[in-house]
Amino acid sequence: MTSVSIHPSVDGGVARGGAEGFQGGTLECHCASDKVTVEVSAQTAHNHACGCSKCWKPDGAKFSVVAVVPRDNVEVTAHQEKLKIVDESATIQRHACTGCGVHLYGRIENKDHAFYGLDFVHTELSKQQGWSAPGFAAFVSSIIETGTPPEQMDEVRARLTELGLPPYDCLSPALMDALSAHVARKKGLLH
């Protein structure tokens, strides 16, 4: 067992599967009062550890843990006025609390994007149990961009594999296939 810390929610092991019939919960920012709350009224999918430099990570974590849910199942229920988009030029518009910096959800506004209609959420911000479990790690090499020395990458990949999170330097094969199929449909090559 390696000593590399990936993320507090997976470092002790990854609980497999989500609770049968689970229908979501409430995400809360980290502010002591006047918390931003977001209701997610569905189970998440494609939960994964993400090493990209844009995703919100708790202090000391090399990766975020993020999943997707249909955007119609995401609703800000308190203190929407505290939310601000982190980077307006990014594909995923990450809505962060201006008080504590936590990203509550990310939304793709480009209707031509393959993942349009899906919002990105960090289920660790919820007290409810039963969310889908992480199943892979994406954008692993990107942690170098946030300060991880390249010589540690073999150990990081070994730890991800040990946790049952296959490491990819892009998305999982199923998600990459979905992106490519979307492009092929737009070109008229698939229907």
UniProtKB/Swiss-Prot annotation:
Cleavable signal peptide: none
An annotated GO BP: formaldehyde catabolic process
Pathway noted in the entry: One-carbon metabolism; formaldehyde degradation; formate from formaldehyde (glutathione route): step 1/3
Enzyme Commission code: 4.4.1.22
Catalytic activity: S-(hydroxymethyl)glutathione = glutathione + formaldehyde
GO function terms (MF aspect): S-(hydroxymethyl)glutathione synthase activity; zinc ion binding
Function statement: Catalyzes the condensation of formaldehyde and glutathione to S-hydroxymethylglutathione.
The protein's name in its UniProt record: Glutathione-dependent formaldehyde-activating enzyme
Biological source species: Xanthomonas axonopodis pv. citri (strain 306)
